[in-house]
Amino acid sequence: MSWFAIRVTYGRELKFKQLLNDAGFECFVPMRKKTVEKDGRKVILTVPAVANLCFVNSEKSLLDKFMRSFGDSCWGRYIWDKATRKPIIVPDKAMDDFIQISRVMSDDVLYLKEITSKLRQGQKVRVVKGPFKGVEGTVVRIKRSRRIVVELPGMLAIATTYVQPQDLELM
């Protein structure tokens, strides 16, 4: 089983995730909290953090069969690796770390769509304490604070909130 990145059309991430869950697939849509004003009151909503993105843990053949059952009207399509011309498969450890960071749903967690060489230059570390315990990534300074960046190859990266130096272990 592998984690596949799926591009979902027209903001239907949660509906597509529900369809997949009902069919027995393991899915993940990164979420964040958003404050909106409704009738003069502030309301906190939980919305997808990255537009049109869903991750599915499955055998490719089963996922293909599910998506083909909708014909051309399927809401999801694989995100392709341009170099290999195959669907992007996210490594299990990177996906586990991504999910762990995403579930914190803090305003300080950043989703980075552009992965620059600066993000790859930091030291490789493992978090040994706190809400991100077990996460492995690269230490990078973003917005004046030391954060751990976990990259999903070929797609995006996620940066944690500030992590204390004593909570880190060099790899």
Predicted regions and their residues:
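Acidic-enriched and Gly/Ser
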Residues: 1-121, 138-171
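Short coil-to-beta-strand transition motifs
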Residues: 128-135
